[in-house]
Amino acid sequence: TDMSAQNAAAADTVAAVTETITEVVAAPAEEASAAPDTVGELALGLNTVWMLLAAMLVFFMQPGFALVEAGFTRVKNTANILMKNFVDFMFGSLLYWFIGFGLMFGAGGFIGMPHFCDLSFINNGLPTEGFLIFQTVFCATAATIVSGAMAERTKFSMYIVYTIFISVLIYPISGHWTWGGGWLMNGEEGSFMMSHFGTTFHDFAGSTVVHSVGGWIALVGAAILGPRIGKYGKDGKSKAIPGDSLTISALGEFI
């Protein structure tokens, strides 16, 4: 009986030790498997924070544009300039969310497939809502660049038409070519870019999609509209048109 009790106690001890060893060995393995998930979540969080911070900085360009344009134009046109910039961002954001975002990042070579008010089609490893905000402020920037070039010589109603056009078509299509999987970034063998140049087109910070697109449209608009009324006299000589406030314009330039 004593031997049986001793054997039972020994067996219980061995079982307890074995269970403890198993737990000790399994714990690091579980921690190791959980570590990549933790690192991935941390990287996603940092990327999201940085993306939203960059979006905020790009959005801050909007008051900068407004101050520059209001400072360099005459005081009688200040309200018109400020309202254009406000409506530019308001209408542009809504239209880009409803239509432009799908055209920019939908499947397709020349233009993306439309996804009206639908964000479920995109999965790039980032929160879709945050990525939408990031792209929206870029679209608004491309549209607002044109406002200064055509200041004091564009009807308010026609400027709204232009805002709709660039937010729905021009920026989404050019953005699709370079950022949305379009033909300029197609790296497949036999594609246009690879067969002609051996590489794809890269635009890391919007120098082409945002600034060149807005700049070229501004140039075309200024060339079509011509100089401001009163800029040249009957003799063809240029006349100075003093702005409202150099202080305001300087502040806008710094922003």
What annotation goes with each model-predicted range?
Residues 3-255:
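Hydrophobic alpha-helical transmembrane bundles of multi-pass membrane proteins
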